[in-house]
Amino acid sequence: MLLLLLKWYLKYYISTYMDNRPSKGNFLEILLRSSKTVFSVQDVALLWGESESTTITNRLKKYIRAGKLLRVRHGLYAKDENYDRYELATRIYTPSYIGFETVLTREGVSFQYYGNIFVASYLNREIEANGQKITYVRMKRSVLSDTTGINHVNGVAWATKERAFLDRLYVTKEYHFDNLNVLDWDKVFEILTVYENKRLEKQVKKYHRNFVNTQ
């Protein structure tokens, strides 16, 4: 039923807003001009103004065989090897955003290096996509859908360091953070209300108290 509704919406969108389909030979150019580096079949359908999935997949297969596009995951395609791996990580399972150790390490909260990309999503899973290991960490739906402390950069959703700090404590009761000096504690307590979790509130107050006592 959901698939039928999606196909109906796609046909409606195309017929209403995308009557001017690209001319033959311009299909690849349209993808290459897009700001996206990773495409789903649905993305391509909208860009091409094409509602027939068979036509889309056949055309994509032709470009892949010719070496003009790269298939990075089932149903996901990239312009070339220089695609944004974080964009890919958030396109495999949605909704999702980059967070946890990926953000904590980049922001100097944790010093340990991780090769995995850590992503908050609706399931726990570790996969490998085109050589990149990606760890998905399950979050409660109400938390996952709340965008407080989430920034969008080049089409990719990223947790702020304060959100990543709270997310990690939300799923891991005890955790060692190397450097809490970089956190904005006003933002931490602002985002904390998203979780509606008494255990987390007590834990954060404990970390804050210990932080203050060491200053």
What is each of the regions a protein language model found here?
Residues M1-M18, N213-Q215:
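Intrinsically disordered, low-complexity and often Lys/Arg-enriched segments
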Residues Y12, A78-Q215:
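Nucleic-acid-binding surface
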Residues L10-P95:
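Short beta-edge/loop segments at beta->alpha junctions of small alpha/beta modules
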